[in-house]
Amino acid sequence: MKYAHTTTGGMIMQITNGVQLHFMKTEKFKDIGISIRFRSELEPKLAASRSLLALMLCDRCKTYDTKKKMSDYLDLLYGATLNAQTAGYGSAQIVEIRSKIINPCYVQGKQQLLESLFSFLQEVLFQPLLQEHVLEESRSILKAKIERMEDDPAQYAITQGLKLAGEGDYLGISALGDVKTLMQLTLDDVKAAYQRMLEKDVIDILICGAFDDTQMEQLVKAHLPFAARKQEIKTFYKVQNQLHDERKTEYRNITQSSIMMVWFTNTAINDPDYYALRVANAMFGQYSTSLLFQEVREKNSLCYSIYSNLISYDAALGVTTGVEKEHIDKTISLIRKQFQ
């Protein structure tokens, strides 16, 4: 067993190759949070499969084979929660299973509460109900979520901006997947993604709250018996794209136009000048005192809000704002001027 202590007072231990356990001890909360994160390379088809899988895992399992049974059991655990999400971190996609439960010290005579929760998580992860009707229900939910994002002009501009700037690279891949790919997925695709996730993904188990280290370590080992894996999945990289001054315009019958601009910083999060870049971004467009806010909003009254954001894991920087269509060119010109 390998142990390491972080600068923030946490502890990291290696359970087996490719599986790490992170303890974040704090007395601030009256509950204990558990996060199980599966990390794999970000691929278009796999991203959609894993997004579906995340929904299916938290929907029902073989022991609790209906939504009601799942909900009723969580209620028995004093309102414990269970949810899942997918997210992109540079060249990787994370499937995160999260649960939260009241600390047993606040429940008289319920010291086995954590044992019950870990048994439940074991069922969820190792005995999922991957069936056709669950797939179709989850597909409908995920499709609606993606379409809602596309209906939002600001979010759509961001998505399309990243897709254009990251064409042929990880930056251009949505961690949720796209509707076309989603509708073509079969149950076998999801089952294959599940097996790959369980057997090959790099896994981080994070536990936050007030608890006994030894007891928690024993619970993790007993109920989350992940096998060793050799794969190493990196997250940060530098996007490689030869685009220069590319522009894409789409039209909708709406009052305000949304703008997304992307630059490649060529600075990864482990580069020596990364923190200098963060300071530069703060000055450029992260706060109300920044150049973008003062020049574009305050002095020229072209928009209500404007901000820049580092897309750190991809070595990129984005600027988003919404303006009247007659002010698009002037706004873009001012943004470029402040950037220079």
Please tell me what each predicted stretch does.
Residues 4-6:
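Short hydrophobic alpha-helical segments enriched in small aliphatic residues
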Residues 9-33:
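N- or domain-start disorder-to-order transition segments that initiate the globular core
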Residues 30-50, 68-120, 155-180, 204-208, ...:
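M16 family metallopeptidases and their MPP-like homologs
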Residues 51-60:
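Active-site SXXK
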Residues 71, 120, 127-147, 234-241, ...:
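Acidic/histidine-enriched alpha-helical segments
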Residues 171, 175, 180-181, 199-268:
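An aromatic/glycine/proline-enriched structural segment found at the starts
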Residues 266-286:
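A conserved active-site cap/scaffold subdomain adjacent to cofactor or substrate pockets
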